[in-house]
Amino acid sequence: MPRALLTRLRRPRLDHRPVRTLAAALTLLVITAPTAPLGAQIAASEFAARRDALVAALPDGVFLALGNPEPVLDYVTFHQDPYFNYLTGFDEPGASLVIVTRGSERREFLFVQGKDPAREVWTGNRLGVAGVRPTLGLEGRDAANLAAVLDSLLAIHPALHVAGDIGRRMTERSLHDQFLDAVRAANPRVEVVDARRAVDQLRGRKSTAELDRLRLAGEITARGHLAALELLTPGIAEFELQAAAEYVWRREGGDGPSYGSIVGSGPNATTLHYNRDDRTAQDGELIVMDLATYFDGYAADLTRTVPVNGRFSPAQRAVYKIVLAAQLAAERQVRVGGPARAMSDSATAVLAAGLTELGLIESPDATYECGTTAQARNCPQLSLYYMHGLGHGIGLVVHDPDQYTRTGRIDVGSAFTIEPGLYVRRNLLDIIPDTPRNKAVKARIGAAVARYADIGVRIEDDYLVTETGIIRSTAAMPREIAAIEQLLAAPRRPRDPAVVDRYRRYRTGRPTP
C-alpha cells in the first residue's frame, strides 16, 4: 500500500544513540521464502522489557499511553491503539497505562474497565482490575479513576509524556486529544509532551516474536491472493476477488484486512488508493490487487498486478518489466548494515531509465514546470508516473515505524515493504500546467501517454531482516510474468454471475456487462 512522496526513504534525523554493527554488516544476505514457525505467544516479559527500554529513554515523571475507546458504531471490530498495544499487549477498550518514575523508584499502573456482568452480556468478559496483576504483571486500577489519579500525580510532576492517537487530525480532534484537553484544563502548569517518537524508536526494531507474526501474516496474505486469482476472468467484479482473498485470511486465522482492500481494474489501476472495488474487470485490462491481512495484530502488505484475460499485452508487458526490474534492483540492496537509501535510489534509476525508453519522459533527469504561477518550480517528469515512496515499515499497523528511518541503515529486526509502481492516467497531460515550456513537453510525450493510457502497475512484497537471513514473507505469490501467466492459464473456479448482476441492478440500474 503506497505512502505519499514525503515518506520516500531519505536521510534520517540525527540520533545520538549508537547504531548497531555486525561483522557481516556489508554482506548481502540471501533473500529466502518463509521458514518454520516459532509458534508462541509474546511473553509478558517481552512487554516488560519494552517498558524498561522506554523508561530508560524518558526523563523522570509521568508517562501515559492511552488505549482506544470502545467502538461507537454498531459494535464494529475493536482495534487497539498501537502505542498502548506495543507496551502492554492488552486488547480491551478503554484502558490506559501509567508509568511514574523518580530516580530508582518506579510504579506501573494499568487502568482497565471494571467487571460489569450486565455489560459483559453485550461485549464479552472483561479482565477486570483484579485480573491485571496475575495476567500482565502490572498494578491494576479502575479506568474510571484515571483522571483523578493523573491530577494527583501531576501536582507533583511538571510534565506528562503521552503516546496515543494524538495530534493527527486536521479537523476533528480524537478522543485521546479531547482527554488531554481536559487534563491541561485541570493542570494548566503541566507540560504535555508527545512521547510517540520514543516509542517509535523501539517499535522500529522488531523482536523474534514480532517477525514471526509478520512472516505468518505475509504467508496467509499470499494464499489469499492466490485464491482470488483462481476466480479472475473477464467480467468478474472487483469485489469478488476481494471477497475470495478475505475469506481465505479469516479461514486461516488472520484478523482481517490490515487496510482498506484495493482491487482496481482498467483505469482504476492508476488510482493509488482505489478501494470502492465495484467495477467489472474487462478483457484486455490489468488489475491491481493491493490487499493484505493482520495476523495476531501484525500487518502484512502485498500488491500484485495481473492481466484480466491471463496474458499481458505488449504495452502492459513493457511497463510491468520496468516495475519488476525496479523492485529487483531495490531488493539487491537489502543487506544488514547497508544504507536504506540505496534501495530507493536503485529503484528510481530503473524506473526513470525505463520511462525514457518508452517515451513517457524525455530523459531520466527531465523536469516539467509544476506548482503555481506565483510559485513556479521544476518537478521530475518521473513523478508524473511514480508519486509515492518505495516502501515503509510494517508491524502493528501497515505503515509502522522502522529503524532505518532513524539510523539510515538496514539492520536485524527491520520489517518493511518494497513497492515501486508506475501509473499512466489517461488524463495525465491535464495534470501538467499549461505553460509554454510544458506545451513542448506534452507534445513530445503525448503519443506515448496515449499508447500506455490506463496501465497501472505496482508490485509489492514484505521483507523481514532476521538473525539468519532476509525473508520475503509474501514470496508464495508469483511476480514474474511467465509464472503469473502460467497461474492464470489454469481452469477458472466457477462463480455465480447472477449474484453480481443483482448488485449491479441495485447500484447502477443495469446488469453486469
Question: Across the structure, where does each feature detected by a protein language model lie?
Answer:
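N-terminal secretory signal peptides that target proteins for export/translocation
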Residues: 1-17
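Active-site neighborhoods and metal-handling regions in enzymes and metal-associated proteins
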Residues: 6-9, 38-513
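Generic short amphipathic/hydrophobic targeting helices enriched at N-termini
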Residues: 15, 26-27, 38, 146
